[in-house]
Amino acid sequence: MASLIRLSSVWQRGMRPVLLCHTQLSRGSACPRIGDVDYTEPAGRIHTASSSTGISASQHWTGERVMTLVLLGMAPAAYLCPGPVVDYSIAAALTMHGHWGIGQVLTDYVHGEVKIKLAKVGIFLLSTATFFGLCYFNYNDVGLCKAVVMLWQK
């Protein structure tokens, strides 16, 4: 009842409730427009994981999201048609996804020039070892798809 009294007081003042409006609210964008960004700011203050690759941060972010969607699509593919192509694709996609994810954590929490360089070398070595380990497993054992099936069997 109190909410009805409150709504009636709002309507008396000439305002329409937001939920009953048929027009969309027009707010300012949370992101600046393309022409409003100052690209002359020193890059030392901006932490982007893609600074070494030469692509913009938005393209890098888009690539990460595409890779996440590809991984989601690989789950049914691995179940429906397991094989070497899917095994090696999953190995590559998991390695890239993990590399980018841990790289973002390192970007956020590792500070100092020497520590950042050591962290980048470490993540590169870890990602390389992960990829070659998964490829070794795919080549010399049953493969990732069949290994997951074996884990879920009784």
UniProtKB/Swiss-Prot annotation:
It is a multi-pass membrane protein. Keywords: Electron transport, Heme, Iron, Membrane, Metal-binding, Mitochondrion, Mitochondrion inner membrane, Transit peptide, Transmembrane, Transmembrane helix, Transport, Tricarboxylic acid cycle. Residues 107-115 are mitochondrial matrix. Heme b binds at residue 97. The chain crosses the membrane at residues 59-80, 86-106, 116-137. Disulfide bonds: none annotated. GO terms for cellular component: mitochondrial inner membrane; respiratory chain complex II (succinate dehydrogenase). GO terms for biological process: mitochondrial electron transport, succinate to ubiquinone; tricarboxylic acid cycle. Pathway: Carbohydrate metabolism; tricarboxylic acid cycle. Residues 81-85, 138-154 are mitochondrial intermembrane. It comes from the Eukaryota. It is found in: Mitochondrion inner membrane. Belongs to the CybS family. This is Succinate dehydrogenase [ubiquinone] cytochrome b small subunit A, mitochondrial.
